[in-house]
């Protein structure tokens, strides 16, 4: 059927088993050829040693390994948006030791002032920093202790004071103890 010498043997179609002697497949390698031709003639002890050598390396996946084992020195980048700013920024919460350092960093990040005053007196400032917690609720920055804030914060937003009242966000009286 196929003409010899033209290299068309590989494209030859057959119905059923070949009548001739099976040829060694020269185009593709079998798994045993890739594996180095490991023979199964040895005892069960030999097979166990081969299995140990051929185990999958890197399991569990690297991503879950990093999440579980590299918590120390990790970075907690949070998205920060500001009303009126056409861009978002990210800030690492782990670099800051408290709300005052965070407020100063936000002021430098967006070139605005008054965020630090908003933490102390939210009634007399133009902008108010708020955050979304794990439950999806928006809260004022400074309402909870710093450690709890770091654990629950998903993203930050700097709103105008008039818009924050629409969210029904009122500062708690005990706000100054966390600052």
Swiss-Prot record:
InterPro entries noted in UniProt: AUX/IAA_dom, AUX_IAA, PB1-like
Which segment of the chain is annotated as a signal peptide? none
Motif mapping: EAR-like (transcriptional repression): 13-17
Does the keyword Heme feature in the UniProt annotation? no
Which cellular component appears as one GO term in the record? nucleus
Function, as annotated: Aux/IAA proteins are short-lived transcriptional factors that function as repressors of early auxin response genes at low auxin concentrations. Repression is thought to result from the interaction with auxin response factors (ARFs), proteins that bind to the auxin-responsive promoter element (AuxRE). Formation of heterodimers with ARF proteins may alter their ability to modulate early auxin response genes expression.
Q: What is this protein called?
A: Auxin-induced protein IAA6
Task: Name the species this protein comes from.
Answer: Pisum sativum (Garden pea)
Q: What is the lineage of its organism?
A: Eukaryota, Viridiplantae, Streptophyta, Embryophyta, Tracheophyta
Q: Which gene encodes it?
A: IAA6
